[in-house]
Curated annotation (Swiss-Prot):
It is a single-pass type II membrane protein. Residues 1-24 are annotated as: Disordered. Keywords: Cell membrane, Disulfide bond, Endosome, Glycoprotein, Lipoprotein, Lysosome, Membrane, Myristate, Phosphoprotein, Signal-anchor, Transmembrane, Transmembrane helix, Transport. This is Transmembrane protein 106B. It comes from Rattus norvegicus (Rat). The lineage of its organism: Eukaryota, Metazoa, Chordata, Craniata, Vertebrata. Can form homomers. Interacts (via N-terminus) with MAP6 (via C-terminus). Interacts (via C-terminus) with the vacuolar-type ATPase subunit ATP6AP1. Interacts (via N-terminus) with AP2M1 and CLTC. Interacts with TMEM106C. The gene is Tmem106b. GO terms for cellular component: late endosome membrane; lysosomal membrane; lysosome; plasma membrane. A lipid is attached at G2 (N-myristoyl glycine).
Length: 275
C-alpha cells in the first residue's frame, strides 16, 4: 500500500503534466486549425470568383482598365466601375482653357455675324436723262415725250438686295405730266452696283398747250424745258423694305429726238433744290 500510495502522486503529477502539455498543444493546434480554416474559407471565397479573360466579340473594352481589360458584352449597364479619387479623369486638365476658348469662339462668331449681317445703306444715284423721244399731235396741240432716265444703285451690304420696284414721275411747272412704275426689277449682289434705265411717258397738253408753239418753233435750234424728275426706289432684304427717293431738275429738248451722253447729262443737272 505504501508503494502504491507513494506512486499515485507521482503518477498523478505526470498525468497532470502530460495533460497540461496536451492541453497546451491542443490549444495551439486549435488556434492553428482555426487560422487554417479562416485561410481556407478566404481561399474558398476567392475560388468562387476565378480569373476569366474575355476576348473576341463577346466582350468590350473595360473603361477603367486603361484599355487593357475586358468585360462581358451586354453587362455594361449592370457593372459598376470604381475609379480612384486621384484618377486623372476625375480632374480634367485645361478646363479653364477650354471654357475660355469656347467663349472666345462664340464671341468671334457673334461679332462676325453682326459685322456681315448689320444693315448698311443702299445708295441710289440719279445719273440723268439718257434719251428723249418727241412726237406731236398738231390737231390737239399736244406734245408726247418718252424720257428714259438712268439710275445707279449700289449695295453696300454683304448680302443680296432685291429691287422690288421703281416709281417715277415727271413735273413741269408744278404739274405732273407723266408717271411710271416698274416692278420686280432685279437683285443686286453683295457689294455690287447695277445701272438701271427706266422710261417715263409724258404728255404736255391742255392748259400747257402754249408749249406746243415753243417746241415746234423752227427759228429756235434748241428747245430746252426744265422738268423735275422724281424717283423712288424700293428695296427689300431679310423681309425688310426700304425706300430711297431722289429729285432732280433736268433740261430736256422738246423740239427733237435727243440722246444724251452721261457727261452731258451730269452737266445739265444744275438746277437742284436746296437741301
Amino acid at each position: 500500500m505504501g508503494k502504491s500510495l507513494s506512486h499515485l502522486p507521482l503518477h498523478s503529477n505526470k498525468e497532470d503534466g502530460y495533460d497540461g502539455v496536451t492541453s497546451t498543444d491542443n490549444m495551439r493546434n486549435g488556434l492553428v486549425s482555426s487560422e487554417v480554416r479562416n485561410e481556407d474559407g478566404r481561399s474558398g471565397d476567392v475560388s468562387q470568383f476565378p480569373y476569366v479573360e474575355f476576348t473576341g466579340r463577346d466582350s468590350v473594352t473595360c473603361p477603367t482598365c486603361q484599355g487593357t481589360g475586358r468585360i462581358p458584352r451586354g453587362q455594361e449597364n449592370q457593372l459598376v466601375a470604381l475609379i480612384p479619387y486621384s484618377d486623372q479623369r476625375l480632374r480634367p486638365r485645361r478646363t479653364k482653357l477650354y471654357v475660355m476658348a469656347s467663349v472666345f469662339v462664340c464671341l468671334l462668331l457673334s461679332g462676325l455675324a453682326v459685322f456681315f449681317l448689320f444693315p448698311r445703306s443702299i445708295d441710289v444715284k440719279y445719273i440723268g436723262v439718257k434719251s428723249a423721244y418727241v412726237s406731236y399731235d398738231s390737231q390737239k396741240r399736244m406734245i408726247y415725250l418718252n424720257i428714259t432716265n438712268t439710275l445707279n444703285i449700289t449695295n453696300n451690304n454683304y448680302y443680296s438686295v432685291e429691287v422690288e420696284n421703281i416709281t417715277a414721275q415727271v413735273q413741269f411747272s408744278k404739274t405732273v405730266i407723266g408717271k411710271a412704275r416698274l416692278s420686280n426689277i432685279t437683285n443686286i449682289g453683295p457689294l455690287d452696283m447695277k445701272q438701271i434705265d427706266y422710261t417715263v411717258p409724258t404728255v404736255i397738253a391742255e392748259e400747257m398747250s402754249y408749249m406746243y408753239d415753243f417746241c415746234t418753233l423752227p427759228s429756235i435750234k434748241v428747245h430746252n424745258i426744265v422738268l423735275m424728275m422724281q424717283v423712288t426706289v424700293t428695296t427689300a432684304y431679310f423681309g425688310h423694305s426700304e425706300q430711297i427717293s431722289q429729285e432732280r431738275y433736268q433740261y430736256v429738248d422738246c423740239g427733237r429726238n435727243t440722246t444724251y451722253q452721261l457727261a452731258q447729262s451730269e452737266y445739265l443737272n444744275v438746277l437742284q433744290p436746296q437741301q
